[in-house]
Amino acid sequence: MEPAVSLAVCALLFLLWVRVKGLEFVLIHQRWVFVCLFLLPLSLIFDIYYYVRAWVVFKLSSAPRLHEQRVRDIQKQVREWKEQGSKTFMCTGRPGWLTVSLRVGKYKKTHKNIMINLMDILEVDTKKQIVRVEPLVTMGQVTALLTSIGWTLPVLPELDDLTVGGLIMGTGIESSSHKYGLFQHICTAYELVLADGSFVRCTPSENSDLFYAVPWSCGTLGFLVAAEIRIIPAKKYVKLRFEPVQGLEAICAKFTHESQRQENHFVEGLLYSLDEAVIMTGVMTDEVEPSKLNSIGNYYKPWFFKHVENYLKTNREGLEYIPLRHYYHRHTRSIFWELQDIIPFGNNPIFRYLFGWMVPPKISLLKLTQGETLRKLYEQHHVVQDMLVPMKCLQQALHTFQNDIHVYPIWLCPFILPSQPGLVHPKGNEAELYIDIGAYGEPRVKHFEARSCMRQLEKFVRSVHGFQMLYADCYMNREEFWEMFDGSLYHKLREKLGCQDAFPEVYDKICKAARH
């Protein structure tokens, strides 16, 4: 009884403290208390529920039977919207706080919400090497199932809660993208419900214009109801090499060289300052040296970016064997390095051993409990951006990031961008090697002002024919946005499919004014 009594006393004291200080004060100044006592246990309950649900649904093979009925229900909702006069635009009914993006869309309150309850894996076809999934299937679900049967996605984006729909309608990337491209480039078919309630399937050879226009469109051409994605044979481990590199010129040269080597299954860099980085290259393998096995996904292990930093501090190269699923979700426990700002002692060994099994808190729950004051503070004093620029511009880009926002660590992830129709493609007619530069954290540039600094960064990205990931704050005006993205095919299909009265334009969903 004593532990229960102690816990009850602590909870009572905490509630009294909240009453005296005010909930907003606690959420802003001692947010870690709220996160540790409430959000971590709640996140664990969410994870257990969704894991058990997905396992039961797949084992009973009920998802394919239910899928057709759910799609018909979506079509019915769209047709009812038309019969009622199509008075407002449509959007998905999923609450904005459930998404992984930093902001919540204001349009959810004014648009017609179409409920889309599609969160299951429908089929794994190992002969055709295809997995067919619904749009709300998460990367955590995908890895749990596929790796257990010896398969994986060629590109498997990092965070557990990222959904297939978000990765298609937005975008997704991983350290294998230098071989396979973005997430959209491993998809072979999309199934959608259009503005008139009709159902359509599109592939590179069937309804190809729609197939190439869907990625990055943020649900403004139709409602995604299923996708077919390539799968490849998996191996048990990733043989990962760590190489610290000093000097910006050497970093850029080494990273470019490793990104061009197709024998590397994975390439990633963590930049800890403008002239200090660790470059990691990996290959999948079934063989392991037991003395070099590192199960980095175990809850008591150090956060991955801190583990990598040790190679830089000691200026030594390293070789480790990491279980494949642990590698895929190596940044999940620390949400890259964002969790250090929420739970400052989160990487402390004592905290990891006692509470690490509950980490991380759900990003959706962090958003839900953010509050307006904290949201404004984050906007002015926190940056979460992914900018995609040609690899040949890497050195120039890193100088620009240093001058405009000065955030470290910086994530470096290469990808090949094919010359295909759609919103995003290289400037020329051939595939080109690009790099995702991810900046997440508190800017250390003097007199940082979010709007002016980010507009300066966006201007640079446009000037080198780069792209901004659309989950992040976008300060561009409409003209600048369409200078960055190729809207020719997109606008043609919007008119052809009757989307102009059914869905907002993509800019109106992602611009700063559309989110809070």
Curated annotation (Swiss-Prot):
PROSITE patterns: FAD_PCMH. Belongs to the FAD-binding oxidoreductase/transferase type 4 family. The record marks 122-123, 383-384 as: Cleavage. Residues 58-234 form the FAD-binding PCMH-type domain. The lineage of its organism: Eukaryota, Metazoa, Chordata, Craniata, Vertebrata. One of its GO terms (biological process) is cholesterol biosynthetic process. The keyword Endoplasmic reticulum applies. Interacts with DHCR7; this interaction regulates DHCR7 activity. Its cofactor is FAD. Catalyzes the reduction of the delta-24 double bond of sterol intermediates during cholesterol biosynthesis. In addition to its cholesterol-synthesizing activity, can protect cells from oxidative stress by reducing caspase 3 activity during apoptosis induced by oxidative stress. Also protects against amyloid-beta peptide-induced apoptosis. It catalyses: cholesterol + NADP(+) = desmosterol + NADPH + H(+); lanosterol + NADPH + H(+) = 24,25-dihydrolanosterol + NADP(+); 5alpha-cholest-8-en-3beta-ol + NADP(+) = zymosterol + NADPH + H(+). The chain crosses the membrane at residues 32-52. It comes from Macaca fascicularis. Residues 23-31 are lumenal. Pathway: Steroid biosynthesis; cholesterol biosynthesis. The keyword Oxidoreductase applies. Its EC number is 1.3.1.72. This is Delta(24)-sterol reductase. InterPro entries: Diminuto-like (IPR040165), FAD-bd_PCMH (IPR016166), FAD-bd_PCMH-like_sf (IPR036318), FAD-bd_PCMH_sub2 (IPR016169), Oxid_FAD_bind_N (IPR006094). It is found in: Endoplasmic reticulum membrane; Golgi apparatus membrane. It is a single-pass membrane protein. Pfam families: FAD_binding_4. Keywords: Cholesterol biosynthesis, Cholesterol metabolism, Endoplasmic reticulum, FAD, Flavoprotein, Golgi apparatus, Lipid biosynthesis, Lipid metabolism, Membrane, NADP, Oxidoreductase, Signal, Steroid biosynthesis, Steroid metabolism, Sterol biosynthesis, Sterol metabolism, Transmembrane, Transmembrane helix.
